[in-house]
């Protein structure tokens, strides 16, 4: 078994694609439209291939906002320079909700941001991912 993708419903597909490409450095891998059921899918990721996990952005035509509820937590992305990545989010008008720094009680460097639709994304500095969270 493997993780194939995580689906996020978005209110403005172009804005979301731009964020995931320009700010997070992902590539647009493919898109698919379904006129009968009125939705468009965009798949983004860092690698293309059967073993690579992807983000699926789903735009339901005419729906511009969703309630997230309390069940969704976040996705996590390893980054080489967490401070520069947070600055790129800020420069794009994004929201940094937890500044980069060590996790409480440990040395793993993390930050939290929100994408244009308010989904939470955790950044973990790559040199920290080897030791695991909380170390």
UniProtKB/Swiss-Prot annotation:
- Report which superkingdom the organism of origin falls in: Bacteria
UniProt keyword list? Lyase, Metal-binding, Nickel
Pathway it works in? Secondary metabolite metabolism; methylglyoxal degradation; (R)-lactate from methylglyoxal: step 1/2
The record lists the organism as Haemophilus influenzae (strain ATCC 51907 / DSM 11121 / KW20 / Rd)
Q: What does the record say about how the cofactor binds?
A: Binds 1 nickel ion per subunit. In the homodimer, two nickel ions are bound between subunits.
User: What quaternary structure, including any partners, is listed in this protein's UniProt entry?
Assistant: Homodimer.
Its Enzyme Commission number(s) read 4.4.1.5
Protein name as annotated:
Lactoylglutathione lyase
Tell me which family the UniProt entry assigns to this protein: Belongs to the glyoxalase I family.
Pfam families in the cross-refs: Glyoxalase (PF00903)
Q: Can you name one GO molecular function term for this protein?
A: metal ion binding
The keyword Protein biosynthesis is annotated on this UniProt entry = no
């Amino acid at each position: 078994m493997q993780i194939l993708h995580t689906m996020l419903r978005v209110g403005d597909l172009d804005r979301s694609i731009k964020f995931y490409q320009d700010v997070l450095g992902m590539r647009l891998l493919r898109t698919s439209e379904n006129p009968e059921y009125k939705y468009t899918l965009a798949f983004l990721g860092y690698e293309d291939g059967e073993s690579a996990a992807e983000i699926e952005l789903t735009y339901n035509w005419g729906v511009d906002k969703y309630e997230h509820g309390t069940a969704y937590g976040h996705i996590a992305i390893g980054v080489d320079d967490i401070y520069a990545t947070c600055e790129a989010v800020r420069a794009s008008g994004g929201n940094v909700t937890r500044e980069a720094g060590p996790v409480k009680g440990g040395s793993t460097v993390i930050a939290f941001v929100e994408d244009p639709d308010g989904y939470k994304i955790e950044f973990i500095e790559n040199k920290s991912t080897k030791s695991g969270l909380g170390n």
